[in-house]
């Protein structure tokens, strides 16, 4: 029996602002518990929220990146529920008039492109954090009031692989706008998943199950793979799917029942009386749009068409805005695009992974990387010497000056190399005889001897040309 899978995702993205959405408390990850709070965050009676204009502008940016329609007249609502990490007993969110709706992003799976619709995007405040330890429960309200956007997809996702691709495409586009760092390890991006299956040919959606607060795209994919299989087995055995909230166990790779939902939650939404509606006119939207940088898809096309990079290389370079900007700046400094791409993906990426640092936290700059690459292109240095130059750059040296100070300029002058070639040949008659007898490896040995005498500074291309001419003349 064949089944059709339907998946919807709700992605919560923490916005990168200096202060919270309705209070002046700072937004800082890793602070001492309850250090970044005030009376508004604590929900004291009589205190009033003040909307953060920067949050609305971040919402406009994100909506634009998601090709969404921006609501010109939007307002906030109260979502009523009680929990210790929510001291007001309600959350300020958007329900009736979210800031944006009807957007889309494009994904690619197995070489096939597909548009995934976005139902809506709304702004809301985050809740605090509960920690349970021994016989005590602790409440940390540092996160309370942190601005979020929640992006709700349409039920257009048809497989766990598509869900993974959607999350990755969404992460890239949001990160490129600069409204969030989307660091999942710090909770800046969390995903709620909904999945249902139905027999092929049926138009009626199946009963969905949900899993909340997944903080890894791999967990999103693995939880959906397991749940897809589980639901198929239940239906094929003649059972029925219940509407459930389940938890994904990272250790076992299984989903575990948390609770059965007999109906939809009633949060008794009503308009937030303490915050006026927000009117967003076309001029405001236009001014915000001007600050949005080139998106990853456009950059990938430019890298392929303008620089001749492969689709794979263009994809790697646009994984983050940081790397993409660095590449563009390096090429603007005169570096060969393909060499710049190779170094960023190779030596640079290996260094970042080994030392566990961000690119912008190193001594590498587009100027000094381009300086090294230009010396490779004009054969001032060899690729072998470039390895040493790269290490020197990462230790804080300027590449051109360092190469000159160390006397590592590549020797390319035939007039200076010919005597060295002759000397090596004079002392290696056996290798000359081997070459004349068709043993090509003799050439490699002779090149190695020449490179040894020049301490690796001889231009290999020139050496090979001189050597072959000299061998044939003997």
Swiss-Prot record:
Keyword check for RNA-binding: no
A Pfam family that the UniProt record links to this protein: GatB_Yqey
Lineage: superkingdom: Bacteria
GO biological process: one example: glutaminyl-tRNAGln biosynthesis via transamidation
GO molecular function, one term: ATP binding
UniProt keyword Kinase, yes or no: no
EC number: 6.3.5.-
The reaction(s) this protein catalyses: L-glutamyl-tRNA(Gln) + L-glutamine + ATP + H2O = L-glutaminyl-tRNA(Gln) + L-glutamate + ADP + phosphate + H(+); L-aspartyl-tRNA(Asn) + L-glutamine + ATP + H2O = L-asparaginyl-tRNA(Asn) + L-glutamate + ADP + phosphate + 2 H(+)
Keyword terms, alphabetized: ATP-binding, Ligase, Nucleotide-binding, Protein biosynthesis
NCBIfam families xref list: gatB, PRK05477.1-1, PRK05477.1-2, PRK05477.1-4
Function: Allows the formation of correctly charged Asn-tRNA(Asn) or Gln-tRNA(Gln) through the transamidation of misacylated Asp-tRNA(Asn) or Glu-tRNA(Gln) in organisms which lack either or both of asparaginyl-tRNA or glutaminyl-tRNA synthetases. The reaction takes place in the presence of glutamine and ATP through an activated phospho-Asp-tRNA(Asn) or phospho-Glu-tRNA(Gln).
Family per similarity comment: Belongs to the GatB/GatE family. GatB subfamily.
Assembly behavior: Heterotrimer of A, B and C subunits.
Protein name: Aspartyl/glutamyl-tRNA(Asn/Gln) amidotransferase subunit B
Organism ancestry: Bacteria, Bacillati, Bacillota, Bacilli, Lactobacillales
């Amino acid at each position: 029996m064949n089944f059709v899978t339907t998946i919807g995702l709700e992605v919560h993205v923490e916005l990168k602002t200096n202060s919270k959405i309705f209070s002046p408390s700072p937004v800082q990850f890793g602070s001492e518990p309850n250090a970044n709070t005030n009376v508004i965050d604590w929900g004291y009676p009589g205190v009033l929220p003040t909307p953060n204009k920067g949050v609305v502008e971040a919402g406009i940016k994100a909506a634009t990146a998601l090709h969404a329609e921006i609501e010109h007249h939007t307002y906030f609502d109260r979502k009523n529920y009680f929990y210790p990490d929510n001291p007001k007993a309600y959350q300020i969110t958007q329900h009736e008039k979210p800031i944006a709706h009807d957007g889309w992003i494009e994904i690619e799976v197995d070489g096939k492109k597909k548009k995934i619709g976005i139902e809506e995007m709304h702004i809301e405040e985050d809740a605090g954090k509960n920690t349970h330890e021994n016989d005590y429960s602790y409440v940390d309200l540092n996160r309370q009031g942190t601005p979020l956007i929640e992006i709700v997809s349409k039920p257009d996702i048809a497989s766990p692989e598509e869900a993974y691709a959607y999350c990755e495409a969404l992460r890239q586009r949001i990160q490129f706008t600069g409204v969030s760092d989307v660091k999942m390890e710090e909770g800046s991006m969390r995903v709620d998943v909904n999945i249902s299956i139905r027999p092929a040919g049926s138009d009626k959606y199946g009963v969905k199950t949900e899993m909340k607060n997944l903080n890894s795209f791999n967990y999103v994919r693995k939880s959906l793979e397991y749940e897809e299989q589980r639901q198929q087995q239940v239906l094929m055995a003649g059972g029925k799917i219940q509407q459930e909230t389940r938890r994904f166990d990272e250790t076992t790779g299984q989903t575990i029942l948390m609770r059965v939902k007999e109906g939809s939650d009633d949060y008794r939404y009503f308009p937030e009386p303490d915050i006026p509606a927000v009117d967003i006119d076309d001029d405001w939207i236009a001014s915000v749009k001007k600050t949005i940088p080139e998106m990853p898809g456009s950059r990938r096309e430019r890298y392929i068409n303008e620089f001749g990079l492969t689709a794979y290389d263009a994809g790697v370079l646009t994984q983050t805005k940081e790397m993409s900007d660095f590449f563009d700046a390096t090429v603007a400094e005169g570096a060969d695009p393909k060499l710049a791409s190779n170094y960023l993906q190779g030596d640079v990426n290996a260094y970042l992974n080994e030392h566990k640092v961000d690119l912008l936290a190193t001594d590498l700059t587009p100027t000094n990387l381009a300086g090294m690459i230009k010396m490779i292109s004009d054969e001032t240095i060899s690729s072998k010497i470039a390895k040493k130059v790269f290490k020197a750059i990462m230790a804080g040296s300027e590449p051109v000056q360092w190469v000159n100070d160390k006397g590592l300029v590549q020797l390319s002058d035939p007039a200076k190399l010919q005597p060295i070639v002759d000397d090596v040949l004079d002392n290696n008659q056996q290798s000359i005889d081997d070459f004349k007898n068709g043993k090509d490896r003799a050439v490699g040995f002779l090149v190695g001897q020449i490179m040894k005498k020049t301490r690796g500074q001889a231009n290999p291309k020139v050496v090979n040309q001189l050597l072959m001419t000299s061998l044939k003349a003997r």
